């Protein structure tokens, strides 16, 4: 979804943006770009194949929702046809998405609010760390706690439905503009984060909405280009089509959404782009086939804002709720009509739409509402949200909303402490030489970089401003800050305790072109801290991977004169780091988007109050041109169907690609340093079942799919020891190498487990990893099921994807089985 400012720009300049981006420093030939149709698609299955799956399956309330399902059916039985149409059609109102109330039934409506790191359209609310930051903790407790705390704030502001968490984009491309909203460029780590986030939201009494389903891996041309001289639905060029083969769909992009379904997610949001030629929000193979049938999803599917492109076809294909309800770009013109709304009423009356299908749409919407107890004592919508909602200001409302509750509620509680602690734990220490960190009572510090200080445009909303620290990205996934603690503010506060001299310069242009020895007085500082940033936002993909505002030149200028240069990046994700090997750059920390406690969290790490335990949720290549799978950013023809993104890299994204092609990297997936050291020993794999067959037992589908896939079949344990001098947290990671009998195209190794273990110096503790059947299975495109291949699996445990220290081999299925 887009905020209103970006909506206007996108609507007017879509063609310019779509054709204007190039990749800096790239020497790729045309054949390397993803819009070229691959010549050989036989290995992993057919491309562009989305067979119709009709009708849309009815919900059953399975997975423990039966009582709520019964209440939902009773509710639907009392509705008029017009009320049924209202229940599946959004209306402009106080929240970014609204379902109107039905007072005669005691139903107060539904409030849907962004987003994945905060309740965006609200004041006096916290702004948490971004998804990529949370994933960098590799900590299950953090992932759950973050979602639970956010859910508390959503509920206190009267929001029934949180529009998050994010598994799409997964991170296919390093340039993805919204990668920071998601978690990791890996389906397993993202899947764990999705499952725990859904549980956290739900335990707080708020509906989770995993998004964007599915194949939403670029921003460029995510929506069609409309004819400015035509009707409101007259399209010049369709949205880009993500063309994904069957095996890749299951093993990469569907995998984390399966975790979300397994956690009994209330809703799913379908994505803007086309999938194998059909818009994702009317792709019956994806919505009916994959989600509702294969994964047994019992909740409802809502469109992304303006992602609905038809009425009857979308309803039949599995779209249950049209948001925000109107026509036009991003669905923001309700006065022009709706694909749903009155057309639902008319379609039922003339027999075009089966009323039983409409009933199931509403049952799916109301079942999680009752399951979470939102029909009892749920807070009213904070009236101030209506004043802040530029997406649907009051002048656009077609219905009246009863906003009588407390205004300007402060819902933050003690969440600042949580945000600070989590952001510190997420910080990834990439380099630390000459014992540069932690800082040891420095007498003098020099601070450089336009990311160090206060946001000069105010802290309320993040934007790509030149001066001021960057704590979140842009678009609907951002937050409305009450305050941001800048690095400079936090360092100055800490420095006062030790009478440390702090000097600072925040004009990158001046720093990059000045002899910095002329800046510091009276002597060289003990350490030079350089703060760099990289902006990313919804609606556009990144054009380059280096840091913004001449950041590399800033580092070069400082490091040429300061032999203890410490670099901190606040970034959406992947950056080229050409200064990593500079001898005077003694330390590098990746802090990503840390949220409102940005400065405090980095100071905790710099001074050693927190031992960094963050690990990379992606790979940092030596050169940006080495990444595969760039987004499609240029189409030279004007045909309606010309925007195609061929996912011909198949399963080879991020570390899987670099491993498959034996490419050296700067910092590998899962990498991160500590102020202490760790070791592993005594690996062991214990089978948890007497025998394992290649084919899973066929059981009634539950949320998440066949329950047999979620059963643990092995327990792998390893002893972790702190071999250093200070307390710290180790992150042992388990990777699986599949047997040679697995079909071609299988990555050399895949993450299938991780743990986080706090250890005092000299302490040892066992870490354990539960391997499920699905962890040892591949998707067979012929039999259309998950199979465990015959032969020997290699299970490796280490501290990153390329630091594997303990190995054990298991053979779940032998050739004679």
From Swiss-Prot:
Residues at the catalytic site: 304
Pathway(s) where this gene product acts: Glycan metabolism; cellulose degradation
Q: Which UniProt keywords apply?
A: Carbohydrate metabolism, Cellulose degradation, Glycoprotein, Glycosidase, Hydrolase, Polysaccharide degradation, Secreted, Signal
> EC number(s)?
3.2.1.21
Gene Ontology terms for molecular function = beta-glucosidase activity
Task: Extract one GO cellular component term from the record.
Answer: extracellular region
| Localization per record | Secreted
Query: What SMART domains does UniProt report for this protein, alphabetically?
Result: Fn3_like
Q: Name one GO biological process term.
A: cellulose catabolic process
Quote the Pfam families the UniProt record gives: Fn3-like (PF14310), Glyco_hydro_3 (PF00933), Glyco_hydro_3_C (PF01915)
Catalytic activity of the protein = Hydrolysis of terminal, non-reducing beta-D-glucosyl residues with release of beta-D-glucose
Per the UniProt entry, the glycosylated residues are 40, 58, 229, 276, 343, 350, 402, 507, 563, 584, 623, 662, 679, 715
- Look up the signal peptide feature and give its range: 1-20
Q: InterPro entries, from UniProt?
A: Cellulose_deg_GH3, Fn3-like, Glyco_hydro_3_C, Glyco_hydro_3_C_sf, Glyco_hydro_3_N, Glyco_hydro_3_N_sf, Glycoside_hydrolase_SF, Ig-like_fold
Enzyme type, top EC level: hydrolase
Could you say which protein family the record assigns here?
Belongs to the glycosyl hydrolase 3 family.
Q: What exactly does this protein do?
A: Beta-glucosidases are one of a number of cellulolytic enzymes involved in the degradation of cellulosic biomass. Catalyzes the last step releasing glucose from the inhibitory cellobiose.
- Name of the molecule in the record: Probable beta-glucosidase G
